[in-house]
Amino acid sequence: MNSGIDLEMSFTQGVQNLGLSHELAHLLWIPLPMLLVLVSAVIGVLVTVWLERKISAAAQQRIGPEYAGALGILQPMADGLKLLVKEDIIPARADSVLFTVGPILVLVPVILSWLIVPFGQNLLISNVGIGIFLWIALSSIQPIGLLMSGYSSNNKYSLLGGLRAAAQSISYEIPLALAVLAIVMMSNSLSTVDIVEQQNTAGLLSWNIWRQPVGFIIFWICALAECERLPFDLPEAEEELVAGYQTEYSGMKFALFYLAGYINLVLSALLVSVLYLGGWGFPISIDWFSSLIGLSIDNPLVQIIAASLGIVMTILKAYLLVFLAILLRWTTPRVRIDQLLDLGWKFLLPISLVNLLVTASLKLAFPITFGG
């Protein structure tokens, strides 16, 4: 958008105009970004599950959910309530501690990763300087929980699923990190807010997808593999492993895996939006919009409208990618485990290294275009 958009300042000034102190106005602002992220995560999962069911039904020439609310929109809530009231069973010969900790260790890093997702300049919980690498570090914890769940179940299918999950994550974590490193090199920052602001200097044409098309493809493939979406759902392949590492789980513990998968998918789509598609930026200039309605860009009304449009743009870009991921799941065949590992180690890793080298060379040759 524009460096002048500061929703926090506009909010505090508006509250102060009502007669409240600056300290109280700032205190009232603090929970708002957290509330936005929490609501976005919950609604994001519900909408994604509903889209998954409807798109899969369309792909298979079915109607899909239609009785739970209008167009079946309440079906995800019904699924959640069903899992909540089901009996929580721990297998007799399973390691009960690891069996319980595993799903928690899978879900918690995904939720913590939402700390660094910006919906606007001040609409994020934590603008840490190493935000994007913090996400990579947190995502590397998840396979430990998957392996722990597979091992503790005392089931051969669960163990194989856990081992596959660990191998898949290691194979795709490295090219994903190298693709992110190319973005960091151009942006001169690890902050997600700085990366978005750097993409909005010249509108649509300054988005990183035009300067990093190869990196965008690598990142998206690796993100799908990290989310274990088809064609990369080898750890839970139904035809081979029953349900993989989830085989022995039921009730709320199974729901944690279910929830983590969809939260991770929405999170990955949001990060692609932030890193490559300009985040909250949109083609219409805020300066042009403010002059059109005859108000200054510092006007609180313009600030609120601009921030709201930014949130909408971020979500629209993310859900375009979510729609693509769901469509891929129901229209592509599953790859074999050897093909999956070959793709990660023999293709994506060398290509991501070459992409990083080319980015460094272009940064030296064209410092203005590539963020010198």
Curated annotation (Swiss-Prot):
It is found in: Cellular thylakoid membrane. Pfam families: NADHdh. One of its GO terms (molecular function) is quinone binding. Keywords: Membrane, NAD, NADP, Plastoquinone, Quinone, Thylakoid, Translocase, Transmembrane, Transmembrane helix. GO terms for biological process: aerobic respiration; photosynthesis, light reaction. It catalyses: a plastoquinone + NADH + (n+1) H(+)(in) = a plastoquinol + NAD(+) + n H(+)(out); a plastoquinone + NADPH + (n+1) H(+)(in) = a plastoquinol + NADP(+) + n H(+)(out). One of its GO terms (cellular component) is plasma membrane-derived thylakoid membrane. It is a multi-pass membrane protein. It is an enzyme of class 7 (translocase). Disulfide bonds: none annotated. The chain crosses the membrane at residues 27-47, 97-117, 128-148, 166-186, 204-224, 266-286, 308-328, 348-368. InterPro entries: NADH_UbQ_OxRdtase_su1/FPO (IPR001694), NADH_UbQ_OxRdtase_su1_CS (IPR018086). This is NAD(P)H-quinone oxidoreductase subunit 1. It comes from Prochlorococcus marinus (strain NATL1A). The gene is ndhA.
